[in-house]
Amino acid sequence: MKERLKHLAKDEGAAAVGVASAERLAGMASMDPNYVLQGARSIVSLMLPLDGNIIRRYLAKEDHPGLQKHETEVYRKLYSIGRKVAAFLESEGYRAVSVEPNLDYRFRSATEYRKISYAYRQRMMDWLSSASGPLLTRLKRRLVQKFYPRSARGIDWNLIPSFSHRYGAVAAGLGNFGWSGNVLHPDYGARVLFDTVITDAELESDPIMEETPCDGCRYCARVCQSGFIHMTDKTEVTIGGKTSTHNRKAHNLRCILVCAGFSGQNLHKGWSTWSPGRITLPEKDEDIERFWDAFAKENAWKHNYSSKVMSDLIFHTEYGFIRKPKDRFMTTCGFCQFVCSRTRKERKENYEIILEGGEVAEGPNFRFKVLRSGKIF
């Protein structure tokens, strides 16, 4: 059955398929497949690569919509393959669940968070960020100051996913960790996406990759504007008895503030991500949650770029990659993943492309304007 399952996935378009037992994933909460399916005995990891040429145009700030469309299509393709694999397992008499790729965090199901419905959060944030006159703007400000603490209640900034597709991919032998914490494939580097099918079928595990394709170049850390990826501090992860090393990541809000688009420039001047936002993040992680609370309360009620990003972030988190329309998929960073091609030569070229790509400024109606090239997207 395992080979039939793999053939099915590859016939549907998967570039690689791997299998791991649930026992291999004992350890951290995000590795536990029983959260998704009680009685889980195996996981099936699916992989698709991203197009390197599209990524380079994105890194060079030549094409922004192209990457957004491409990444959305690849995620949806992965999920479609996962659903077909799950249907095959169910036809064989087993239970199976295809886990949504990314943005599927456990806090969304928490009682405190669900006291305010998704639809209400979205409508309220869209209204708060809309243009309004002086009187209505003052009312919005008062509402945010009073009700923001309640609306944020229940969010766990640890961002534990329903199931970690990265850990699943490593357990199933599809790749190994790079310094960034992204999973690297020998042929594609980090420009790969994963989905996972969890099942109570007992399937034979594939071998875990013994070595990592990462050679320690640290280009991922060099292109991290937020300081989320440490240059030297490291941590260990053990999967299936094999211990791997990657950087000791900083607080998740560092990544959110840059990768979600609130700020395109923090540590490194002269170039930016695709975000025109400019925020200086606190140096110490212990200050960053207070910084976020103050930032949110100060900007949520304004008709500005930051409030627009907040609205988009709520939309993305609630609807995920699968359900949201493509025009709401606003990638601004991902540089730590996209810089990491297969060879060091390619990574160096990607790094230089980023440095030469210039900065993004805010154009009319919150559109992006690329400085140096003069292009507006």
Each predicted region: which residue ranges?
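Non-catalytic, usually N-terminal nucleic-acid engagement modules in DNA/RNA processing proteins
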Residues: 1-86, 90, 99-104, 113-121
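Short, glycine-/Ser/Thr-/acidic-enriched flexible segments
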Residues: 24, 49-51, 199, 204, ...
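Catalytic cores of enzyme domains
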Residues: 74-336, 342, 352-357
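C-terminal/domain-terminus segments
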Residues: 334, 338, 345-375
